[in-house]
């Protein structure tokens, strides 16, 4: 029937769009694992993946690209949504780590099909640009090596307490912690 063919057409459009995104992300990942992709020319590039992101450690910098996924409680399936959530990640995380979260940078494709950070051409993706944290200064490492003394722990506690005292509360924020919302996001 006509309704069924419209639904099938929408499903086909959706699926082909997701396939195109995965292919595009494949070329982005391939390019971003090469040291010559980056303007600062790191010696090596390491790739780590989470369920929602590709994380490229490129010398002194880290680039995080969101995967085109939809888990219901978050939807990164369009370029516009990924840009929005990159900007939100930058805005939110700068509150605690302004010297670490540096920018949101576009990944571009030029007329020859070459990819670059910034530059000219068509924006095909966005990445959160961060300063790389020295491993020996990470709290997780300091704790594992029994080097997180009282002064370090007091400084962390004070920073977290200041953050929570200044954080917005009420209304929609309270609703996010409701049983109904939590159940919806986990079922």
Residue spans for each PLM region:
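Cysteine-centered motifs
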Residues: 14-15
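Conserved ATP-binding subdomain of kinase catalytic cores across diverse folds
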Residues: 25-187
């Amino acid at each position: 029937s006509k309704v069924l063919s419209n639904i099938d057409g929408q499903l086909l459009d959706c699926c082909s769009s997701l396939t195109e995104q995965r292919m595009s992300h494949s070329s982005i990942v391939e390019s971003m694992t090469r040291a010559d992709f980056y303007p600062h020319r790191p010696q090596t590039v390491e790739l780590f993946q989470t369920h929602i992101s590709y994380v490229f450690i490129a010398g002194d910098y880290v680039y995080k690209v969101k995967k085109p996924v939809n888990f219901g409680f978050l939807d990164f399936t369009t370029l516009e949504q990924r840009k929005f959530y990159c900007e939100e990640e930058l805005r939110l995380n700068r509150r605690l780590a302004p010297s670490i979260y540096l920018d949101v940078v576009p990944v571009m494709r030029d007329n020859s099909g070459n990819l670059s950070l910034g530059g000219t051409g068509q924006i095909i993706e966005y990445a959160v640009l961060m300063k790389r944290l020295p491993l020996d200064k990470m709290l997780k490492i300091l704790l594992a090596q029994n080097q997180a003394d009282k002064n370090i722990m007091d400084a962390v506690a004070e920073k977290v307490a200041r953050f929570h005292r200044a954080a917005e509360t009420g209304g929609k924020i309270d609703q996010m912690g409701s049983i109904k919302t939590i159940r919806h996001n986990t079922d």
